[in-house]
Amino acid sequence: MSIPEYRETFAIKHDSVSGATAPKYEQILKWWLRNEHGISLPMSAKPWAGICVQHGVDLTFGLADYDKDAGQQQPLDIAQATKLMLDKYDSYEPRTWDEGRDAEEFEAFREHLPEMMANGIAAVKEALQSANMIEGEYQIWHTEEKIDVPIMMFQDYSGGNKQADLKCSLPVRNPIKKDGTRTWRVPKPKTEPTKQQVMQQSVYWKCTGQLPCLLFVTAAGYHVADQQNTPALQEDNLELAYQEVVMSRQ
């Protein structure tokens, strides 16, 4: 597949599933900032917490730093995985230019990560209970003739003709009280995917043929959304969502 000139201008030779639902103007702005000024959007405590929760889950299934040829490796017990997960989390340095907001979130999230990791483990086990073997995250390429570059994707977990995508929701800050302190609300797991999440899952499905399920995880519990309990994840609706993704990238 030849790369069109406007893509070459921004040194962008592929799309990714994670960005497939972003408005085109936003995507072009990101390309321009990265190519012309070397600027990428910075990490923050919230996505970093989700990355670390998945890392902990991966460790307990022997899927950390997954290699498709090697397959699952020796899993760690929950205590070992939790320690390594928190060590990874603690390596992050909060932003210093947002009046302490990121640092406050970083501190508040930490105590809830072990519970989120445990719920993530339970969600993966439930979602892929019929799988003889679980695959972890590795790079997959998909070509769509109506899109002018290849599409890159990374599935969180797959097996038994299903793929599972971990979606973490972190605690939410409450208003500051009169005494100057603040509490945090732990949300219940979501039960319905957003339109953008369905669009993302439609690309995974079209590429692999594996039916998607979304693992909504919080410190309060988890919910597995799949084609059995979520009409939006049934094949007819996935096809409609996929066509919408294709149209949005043209």
Regions found by a protein language model. Give the residues of each.
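Short hydrophobic alpha-helical segments that form membrane-spanning helices or hydrophobic packing faces
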Residues: 29-32, 198, 242-245
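Short acidic (Asp/Glu) and glycine-rich catalytic loops that position anionic groups and cofactors
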Residues: 29-37, 168-170, 220-224
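Hydrophobic/aromatic-lined pockets within catalytic cores
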Residues: 57-65, 168-171, 206-209
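Metal-dependent nuclease catalytic cores that hydrolyze phosphodiester bonds in DNA/RNA
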Residues: 1-154
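Metal-dependent nuclease catalytic regions and adjoining charged, substrate-binding loops involved
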Residues: 136, 193, 203-250
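Secondary-structure boundary elements
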Residues: 126-130, 160-163, 207-213
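Short amphipathic alpha-helical face segments that pack within enzyme cores
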Residues: 52-55, 199-206
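Non-catalytic protein-protein interaction segments used by genome-maintenance enzymes to assemble
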Residues: 141-200
